[in-house]
Amino acid sequence: MNIYIPVGISGSGKSTYQKKHLPNIKTICPDDLRKKLTGDCSNMSMNDDVWMIAYDELSTCTVKNKDVYFSSTNLSTKAIQRIFDTVYGYAKNKNNIHFKILLMKDSENEELCRSRVKADLDNHIDRSNTLKLVDDLEGNTLDYDYIHKQHEEFLVIEKDIYAWRTKIVEDFDFADISITEIGS
C-alpha cells in the first residue's frame, strides 16, 4: 500500500503531479471536501468536518489496503505525523505500507506559484483562493497573501522533514518512508 503525501504551497504542482503520474489512485483532497460541504473550496467554516471526513476516508482506504494520494499542503511535520498515525492505527499489515513524501520544490519559487494560482483563478478553475491577504485575527490585514505565509512554512518543513523521517524510522523499525524532490 502506497500513501503519497505531497508537501507544497498552493500552485506548486501537487494536483498536476497527481493527474499526470497517479491518475488512477484514490485522492483525498480537503479542498474538494470543502466544495462538497459548503459549495466553495475556499470556505473554511466547516473545516473541522472536512478534516474528520478526510481522515475517515484515509482510515477506510487503509483498512482496504488501497493506495492514497493525500492532496493537501501538508506544510508541517504535525500534519504528516497525523497521516502516519492514522494509517498505522488502521493498518492490518504495517510492513506493507510505503509512505512516499513528495517535496514539491516549486514551492521555493513564491512568484511562480502565485502566478499559477492567479492564472487558474483568471481561467475560472475552481481552486482555493490563496491570493487573499492574510488577516492576523486581531482585525489587521497583513501586507502579504497566504502564498507568502505558505512559502515561509515550506522553507521550515523543507529542513525539518528529513529529521522527522529519521526519528520515525528509528522509533518504528517497520516504517518505510521515502522523500522525493519533485520539480525545480
Where are these regions (language model features)?
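Conserved beta-strand segments of the P-loop GTPase G domain that flank and frequently precede/overlap
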Residues: 69-71, 101-105, 181
